[in-house]
């Protein structure tokens, strides 16, 4: 057990994988609860995206699917937490699958944004000629919006309710707007945006590595305990002298009884 467990490192970048995975699970459970509350408040006040659906059954389908998606994400996060606490490595597999899907989605979003960037710049340059120079409040709002987008991307879910909103699937929504900015300012912001997005991708890879290493560690530990438990011989407590004397004699089947004990 010790050699195989020692072969798998219990740390990942100076952090214990169990502690890091537990913190990650608690964070995602809290995020799921907050997302559920936020979406419920939006639906109650009529601010959700489903209010644009004129058809009744489409509105109901969007509501039900959104709440089901958030509920499934909560179950996956809770499964990760239970798996780490109770040392059940199989409970970590759904979250690993979710992280792979989320990383691929972020990567495709970044690639799609840069593929559509030339057309976006051409369109923005035409519209910016009619716009007056920007003021400080506009830049402040753009900076706050950019920081909010980065914080949203730091979550493992990106924007959970917008998975089912096809209007938000435009890749250019993640890029900073060029309204009221010069070309050089926009290039600088794009460089900062790219560095921040790549940093988020590296963070997602690190989270996946922590959970994967924790999964391997728990699997190796559990398999070693099962092997050691199967090799242990069953110990039987021997009876005392009085119990042994009171036990009935065993007569072999088909054979004569043993002769009685007699003193010589």
UniProtKB/Swiss-Prot annotation:
GO CC, alphabetical: lysosomal membrane
Amino-acid biosynthesis found in the keyword field: no
Gene that this polypeptide is encoded by: LAPTM5
Transmembrane segments: 19-39, 64-84, 92-112, 136-156, 186-206
Subunit relationships: Binds to ubiquitin.
Cell compartments where the protein resides: Lysosome membrane
Function: May have a special functional role during embryogenesis and in adult hematopoietic cells.
Topology versus the membrane: Multi-pass membrane protein
Keyword terms of this UniProt record: Lysosome, Membrane, Phosphoprotein, Transmembrane, Transmembrane helix, Transport
UniProt keyword Plastid present: no
Name listed for the protein in its UniProt record: Lysosomal-associated transmembrane protein 5
Residue positions, PTM Phosphotyrosine: 261
Pfam families membership: Mtp (PF03821)
Entry similarity comment: Belongs to the LAPTM4/LAPTM5 transporter family.
Organism whose genome encodes this protein: Bos taurus
């Amino acid at each position: 057990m010790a050699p195989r467990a020692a072969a798998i490192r219990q740390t990942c970048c100076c952090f214990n994988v169990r502690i890091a995975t537990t913190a990650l699970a608690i964070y995602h459970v809290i995020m799921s609860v907050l997302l559920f509350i936020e979406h419920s408040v939006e639906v109650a006040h009529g601010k959700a995206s489903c209010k644009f659906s004129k058809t009744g059954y489409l509105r109901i389908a969007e509501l039900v699917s959104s709440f089901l998606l958030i509920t499934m994400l909560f179950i996956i996060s809770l499964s990760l937490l239970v798996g780490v606490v109770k040392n059940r490595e199989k409970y970590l597999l759904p979250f690993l699958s979710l992280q792979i899907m989320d990383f691929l989605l972020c990567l495709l979003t970044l690639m799609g944004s840069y593929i559509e960037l030339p057309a976006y710049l051409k369109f923005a340059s035409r519209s910016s000629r009619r716009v007056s120079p920007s003021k400080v409040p506009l830049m402040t709002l753009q900076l706050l919006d950019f920081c909010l987008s980065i914080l949203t991307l730091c979550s493992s879910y990106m924007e959970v309710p917008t998975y089912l909103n096809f209007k938000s699937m435009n890749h250019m929504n993640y890029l900073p707007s060029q309204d009221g900015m010069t070309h050089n300012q926009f290039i600088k912001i794009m460089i900062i945006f790219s560095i921040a997005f790549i940093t988020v991708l590296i963070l997602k890879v690190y989270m996946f590595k922590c959970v994967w290493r924790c999964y391997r560690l728990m699997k190796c530990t559990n398999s070693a305990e099962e092997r050691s438990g199967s090799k242990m011989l069953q110990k039987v407590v021997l009876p005392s002298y009085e119990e042994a004397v009171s036990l009935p004699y065993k007569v072999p089947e088909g054979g004569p009884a043993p002769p009685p004990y007699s003193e010589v």
